[in-house]
């Protein structure tokens, strides 16, 4: 397919930061078998506050049974009970519940609002993990502005959107976690929900919709970071996986970063 040369230019720089070259890459527009993404937005907490802005329904995820419904605008404190969840004045005797907005209104968890559904799960450690399930492209609109400035050239933001989309699908395929695909912090990639969205970053996501990086007919492990310090590591040294595009090397692009040069003093007895 034909790609705008400016996108390729900035994509090269994004990949350079990760130690990649463009040889043997294919950028394809594809539709994933499942385009729903599950993001852990809070992990292992004791309580949380939930507020739907519009009509909503709460389901028992395990049985599919409707547990409650409301008009929205109420703030509920959620905590653990002996037999499940205490949701405001309600007791839900299940270890998994799902909150579904009826009119695409966002749902607040704490002070952040999110598109899609919100699930609450009781973990083995008797804590609450909260998961936001939403469409891939909507998820990316909450990721890209947290990983690149919306003031950067649009083609650079579009390159970042392609890399973030590729990384998302690669990590999802690994099935690392039992009931979610990624976290919302730097353990995966930073996700700020609907409240983080910006016009230019959302535009970049929309204009690159479905574009994914492949290497040797496989989704590329598109690892990336804010700054490499001037030198990227061979991916085989980090994850034991040999992948020529991620072999690492010097990165002139990051030389202007304040993190490009650093020093650490170590005592002999250490």
Give the location of each predicted region.
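Conserved, single-site charged/polar hotspot
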Residues: 3-270
């Amino acid at each position: 397919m034909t790609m705008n040369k400016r996108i390729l230019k900035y994509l090269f720089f994004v990949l350079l930061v990760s130690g990649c070259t463009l040889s043997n890459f294919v950028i394809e527009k594809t539709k994933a078998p499942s385009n729903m993404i599950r993001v852990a937005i809070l992990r292992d907490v004791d309580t949380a506050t939930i507020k739907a802005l519009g009509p909503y329904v709460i389901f028992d995820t395990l049985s599919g049974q409707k547990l409650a419904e409301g008009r929205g605008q109420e703030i509920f404190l959620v905590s653990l009970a002996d037999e499940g969840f205490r949701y405001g004045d309600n007791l839900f005797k299940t270890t998994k519940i799902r909150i579904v907005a009826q009119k695409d209104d966002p749902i607040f968890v704490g002070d952040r609002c999110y598109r899609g559904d919100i699930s609450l799960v009781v973990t083995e450690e008797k804590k609450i993990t909260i998961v936001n399930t939403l469409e891939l492209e909507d998820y990316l609109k909450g990721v890209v502005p947290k990983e690149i400035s919306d003031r950067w050239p649009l083609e650079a933001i579009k390159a970042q959107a392609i890399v973030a989309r590729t990384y998302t699908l690669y990590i999802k395929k690994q099935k690392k976690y039992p009931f979610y695909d990624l976290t919302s912090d730097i353990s995966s990639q930073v996700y700020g929900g609907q409240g983080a969205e910006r016009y230019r970053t959302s535009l970049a996501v929309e204009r690159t919709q479905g574009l994914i990086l492949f290497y040797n007919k496989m989704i590329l492990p598109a690892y990336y970071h804010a700054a490499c310090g001037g030198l990227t590591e061979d991916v085989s040294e980090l994850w034991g996986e040999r992948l020529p595009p991620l072999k690492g090397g010097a990165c002139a692009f990051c030389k202007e970063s304040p993190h490009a040069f650093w020093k650490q003093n170590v005592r002999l007895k250490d």
